[in-house]
Swiss-Prot record:
Purpose: Regulatory subunit of the poly(A)-nuclease (PAN) deadenylation complex, one of two cytoplasmic mRNA deadenylases involved in general and miRNA-mediated mRNA turnover. PAN specifically shortens poly(A) tails of RNA and the activity is stimulated by poly(A)-binding protein (PABP). PAN deadenylation is followed by rapid degradation of the shortened mRNA tails by the CCR4-NOT complex.
Protein name: PAN2-PAN3 deadenylation complex subunit PAN3
Subunit record text: Homodimer. Forms a heterotrimer with a catalytic subunit PAN2 to form the poly(A)-nuclease (PAN) deadenylation complex. Interacts (via PAM-2 motif) with poly(A)-binding protein (via PABC domain), conferring substrate specificity of the enzyme complex. Interacts with the GW182 family protein gw. Interacts with Gyf.
Region: Pseudokinase domain, residue numbers: 369-655
TM regions (residue ranges): none
Binding site for ATP: 423, 472-479, 552-553
Gene Ontology molecular functions: ATP binding; poly(A) binding
Organism name: Drosophila melanogaster (Fruit fly)
């Protein structure tokens, strides 16, 4: 049987194109290898074309290794082409259509237009009937650019110049002629035209228009200086280790994998110089086409009528053109908000945020020791809650209007495992269940400045009749009283004789340096006012009243202010004989506004005694001297009880300060979202480390004690040493976060960049690509998963 092969040769207008390097007789392949035998067959085109010196010549171990260019941490030069993830923890990402090209935006150094034109010319030539023995002719004009790269300047079809020769052999037995599978590009050249190198070596140049090189211009190459993907920390990070400069990365079409997971039976595999080559055998006519070292489904609807080398259309959505899942670096709008500290901030959250989160986690996980448990004598379980932990000393008075002591606990729900705050009212017996109407109204109220009520029940688990109210738990919170009205510790043994309740209000010299600290900035006071009025507005619009608006029942979590202990007064002061429980709600709402004015005045003076009846006028005069007129008018309006007031009337008094508060909140959201994206990448790298450490140094697998030291696993072991155990020239450990993160990202992306791995005895040196390492990692971990499932 004879096969029809199309022989395509380009005639360069520049004599430099005839350099012998383009016609290497051995191509860096040993003559005794099967690959050399295959390429020397008469029915295979002679290797020629641009890019050969960038391919097989790289197998020479004597060639110098270029230093890496500066790369942004967590922003490697290779952008993976996989989009989305499945619920499976170790499941790979899916591919998305990307542009197939190499470093020159084309195929084997040609531009996209030239590649498409060459493919069209070959397709037209292939359409000539097999009975015609004359060769069709076409002219492809290629010129050399200033930098030595070939660019397509013109594509001319003429009948006189036979620059492109298509040799066709007529089969001796037409009735036995085999049907060749159509190529991806629409031409008639079989997939058996050239071997394919998985590590980035170019395929047979004779099939250049039909078999794309596995190298493409990445979106990060040549990008603008102000693009979103640019990281400001790129200038601070040097090269991440030895190795050649990263060549462009190949983009794969939809439905294709950058690493062949299942090769046709007629495709031969050979490892030459650390590079795995795949090429079809003689009976590969009906096999599945192999393009760009990947198995392409010819029946995929995305490939019908689409050329494999066609450029990306301008109509393709941006989400389809850039599908990388590697952290692109911080946003330009949050760079100025991030702390200028160590380089580690490029990988991890700031120390201040980490300390705050860790402190909250530590508070949430506190447990009592034996002495504390004996002192409090808490029950093991209360209704549906267990693991009670006291948040304040026991038997603290709840409020001046209430005579029942109260205690606050943190508890864990038995079913969900969530932590809640339990407020226990000691010795309270519920007289009527009519108050549950108000409880249901409070449970429906949801606001960011109000601690939400979840549940109310009575219990005897504490040894008495107790009322328990269940609220959301906000760890690390403190009351407004503890934050702004707690006396500061005295230094050098000095004690102010006029402090606390014993200090007369006429002691003017101490008003500027109160025992509770210096006066608060006006911006802080307005921030508290806006949050309190927002929560109070939600309460009043729900037809309820707070009733306990004082510093002991307002909590502060970071910079968030919330109303707490809501609904307690509605239960403890409920009149079962009243026909309408909401009849007096308007009066209580007016009391809330007066209490808000007293609280703001106390904050401005930083003293609780400033709101006493005899001291109010002097305190307002002090506010006039130290703060703006708007704050004074705000307080005076709340103290005026002659007219009916509304919380809505307070909004114009706040004025444009609301926009300042909104801008601060949005800036904080931007920074937190950027930190979240950073930590999400850390989780992705963690999954790669889990796979590596599950394979490396495994003592036994299926009764094979040497499983982790042989085969593909040996390369993973050497890669582990290259990743974590590198040393400097003088033998000192080389600890570089950028090196570790960058290599893990390249491994996850399946980069075609090659890395030099050396054994610990320095007797073995392997040069492999990250794509091969990823293939080894996936195969080895799949073996572990299969064995664990069985």
């Amino acid at each position: 049987m004879c096969s029809t092969y199309g022989l395509l040769s380009f005639e360069f207008s520049d004599t430099a194109a005839m350099d012998p390097i383009f016609f290497s007789p051995t191509n860096g392949i040993p003559s005794e290898s099967k690959l050399a035998t295959y390429m020397n067959r008469q029915n295979v085109a002679t290797p020629s074309g641009y890019g050969l010196n960038n391919g097989f010549s790289l197998l020479n171990l004597d060639s110098p290794l270029n230093k890496k260019s500066q790369v942004t941490p967590q922003s490697p030069e290779f952008i993976p082409t996989r989009l989305g993830s499945t619920p499976n923890f170790y499941a790979p990402y899916h591919n998305a259509p990307m542009q197939l090209s190499n470093g020159l935006n084309g195929v084997n150094g040609l531009t996209a237009a030239a590649a498409a034109a060459a493919a069209a010319a070959a397709a037209a030539a292939a359409a000539v009937p097999s009975s015609t023995s004359s060769a069709s002719s076409a002219s492809v004009t290629i010129s050399k650019t200033a930098n030595g790269g070939a660019s397509m300047l013109a594509l001319q079809k003429t009948a006189s110049i036979a620059s492109v020769t298509i040799a066709q052999q007529q089969p001796q037995h037409p009735q036995k002629q085999q049907q060749h599978p159509p190529s991806v590009g629409g031409g008639a050249v079989s997939a058996a035209s050239a071997p394919i190198a998985i590590s980035g070596a170019p395929p047979n140049p004779a099939a250049a228009p039909f078999v794309s090189s596995m190298s493409a211009q990445t979106p990060l190459k040549g990008r603008g200086a102000m693009m979103r993907q640019e990281s400001p920390t790129a200038a601070m990070i040097s090269g991440a280790g030895p190795g050649e400069k990263s060549p462009p990365h190949g983009m794969t079409p939809h439905g294709a994998s950058p690493i062949p997971s299942a090769l046709p039976t007629s495709v031969h595999q050979e490892n030459v110089g650390g590079t795995i080559y795949f090429y079809p055998t003689a009976n590969a006519q009906n096999s599945q086409p192999v393009v760009n070292s990947m198995v392409v489904d010819g029946t995929h609807p995305a490939l019908h009528g689409v050329s494999a080398v066609a450029p990306m259309s301008a109509g393709v959505p941006a989400a389809m053109m850039y599908t990388g899942h590697v952290y692109p670096g911080p946003s330009s709008n949050v760079v100025t908000m991030q702390p200028k500290t160590l380089l580690e901030s490029a990988f991890f959250m700031p120390d201040e945020m980490r300390a705050e989160v860790l402190a909250r986690n530590e508070i949430s996980n506190l447990i009592m020791d034996a002495a504390e448990a004996a002192q409090h004598a808490l029950p093991l379980e209360v209704e549906n809650y267990h693991a009670l932990y006291p948040l304040e000393p026991p038997a603290q008075p709840l409020h001046a209007k209430l005579t029942f002591p109260a205690t606050t606990y943190r508890a864990t729900h038995n079913t969900t495992g969530y932590k809640y705050c339990l407020r226990r009212i000691h010795g309270f017996r519920l007289q009527s269940t009519k108050c549950m109407t108000l409880v249901e109204m409070w449970k429906k109220l949801q606001h960011t400045n109000v601690v939400q009520l979840r549940e109310v029940f009575t219990t005897k688990a504490f040894g008495d009749n107790s009322l328990v109210l269940v609220y959301d738990y906000h760890p690390g919170s403190q009351t407004l009283l503890a934050k702004y009205f707690t006396p500061a510790p005295e230094t050098n043994g000095y004690t102010d004789p006029f402090q606390g309740e014993a200090r007369p209000f006429s002691h003017k010299s101490n008003m500027q340096r109160t025992s509770n600290g210096p006066l608060l900035p006006e911006a802080t006071i307005w921030s508290i006012i806006m949050q309190l009025t927002a929560g109070l507005k939600a309460i009043h619009h729900a037809g309820l009243a707070c009733k306990v608006l004082d510093p002991t029942k307002i909590i502060v979590t970071g910079k968030r202010v919330r109303f707490s202990s809501c609904c307690i007064s509605d239960i403890t002061q409920f009149d079962p004989n009243a026909s309408n429980p909401l009849a007096l709600v308007n009066m209580h709402q007016q009391d809330d506004l007066t209490a808000l004015g007293r609280l703001v005045l106390a904050l401005a003076c930083r003293c609780l005694q400033s709101v006493q009846r005899d001291n109010v006028q002097s305190s307002i005069d002090m506010v006039t001297r130290n703060y703006s007129t708007d704050l004074r008018n705000f307080i005076v309006y709340l103290f005026t009880t002659n007219n009916r007031r509304s919380v809505t009337d307070l909004m114009p008094m706040i004025g444009a300060r609301f926009y300042t508060q909104l801008d601060a909140l949005q800036s904080k959201i931007d920074m937190q979202e950027d930190e979240l994206a950073k930590e999400m990448e850390n989780g992705r790298l963690y999954r790669i480390l889990v796979k590596l450490n599950s394979i490396n140094e495994r003592p036994d697998f299926n009764l094979d004690c040497t499983w982790s030291e042989t085969g593909d696993r040996y390369m993973l072991k050497l890669f582990r040493d290259y990743l974590f155990h590198s040393v400097t020239e003088d033998g000192r450990p080389w600890l570089d976060h950028a090196h570790i993160v960058q290599c893990l990202n390249k491994l996850d992306a399946g980069s075609i960049e090659r890395v030099q791995l050396m054994s610990r005895d320095e007797q073995s040196v392997l040069i492999v690509s990250y794509a091969e390492l990823k293939n080894c990692l996936e195969n080895a971990f799949s073996e572990l998963m299969s064995s664990a499932a069985n």
